[in-house]
């Protein structure tokens, strides 16, 4: 096998051999040379198992090759011949349509994800026997269909968290509403238990809904990273990513030997929430400066350069001091001025300059929390946010077009 295959691709020989034996087929006894072109790009992952197996059977004339020119085939093989899900099914489907293929054969779990692409018949298969019989015209596969637009719009308002659950904090809610309307970055400073994380988790519920074009772009990123759930189609809600403060620089911005999207790209068109901001490594925070300006991240390697979109809304929270009770109305702070200053200096000035709204949060009194009256709902706030956007959601829906979607 030539053409810069990685170890996973090289190991496909054993998986293919076992899968074919289980289904009653044998590998050709002669030496086989497989050239994976272009030779200067490294091939990675196990998604080549199924096309390699089918290609070898066709080359040895064990199966018919008449249909193969019309179909792109991708999938990982298990030792028993079953087909496992792969990463990047949606970008693969888009590429298949661009290259003029009429059909795409993928693992059953990836079929709905790929089927959002129009003018392309997508077939989900669960084992290699189904593929062989389909190619030999002994078995018909049913194309997977997805009602893309109906499903997309039906799930746009189904949120787990709602601002109606938040008691008090009207000034913070107003700040979050302004941030949502303008796409501004925001930092909340307050004592532990003042509701910073609770309100941040509810921010996606008041952001304007995704357009179909934004959803396609967001779904492609999550597909490449392998973050889509099984049997998923388009992402219908804005992403909310909240990495732990121990995250590495590569995990935040993306990279690795085979560059993958990082948290800032997974938060594209959504929210990146950094809880306890000063606890993050200084180098991790500093790499956010360029993506916050350019709205994309460039990952450079010796052989290639990859651009990932990173247009996210940064929301951060932090305590005002190491003990957390500086300026607290009832609890005393035990930190000296030097400790407070050292704690605040963990966040650089250039990064703070990129955070448009900085607000202090005061804990809500018990009497306010115990009230029966609910706060304003996310749906009501969201309507005001949509109206405040330069281009309303109604205008977006009337003009959104994406030639790839069903």
Language-model regions, residue ranges each:
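P-loop NTPase nucleotide-binding/switch module
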Residues: 140-178, 213-264
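Peripheral, non-AAA+ core regions of ATP-driven protein-machinery
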Residues: 1-187, 191-194
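A short helix-turn-beta junction within AAA+ P-loop NTPase domains corresponding to the substrate/partner-engaging
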Residues: 331-361
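Conserved catalytic/switch belt of AAA+ P-loop NTPases
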Residues: 286-302, 306
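Conserved small/polar residues in nucleotide/adenosyl-binding loops
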Residues: 394-401
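Walker A/P-loop
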Residues: 189-225
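AAA+/SF3 P-loop NTPase mechanochemical coupling elements
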Residues: 259-260, 265-269, 300-319, 330-331, ...
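Conserved AAA+/SF3 P-loop NTPase catalytic/coupling segment centered on the Walker-B
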Residues: 261-292, 326, 351
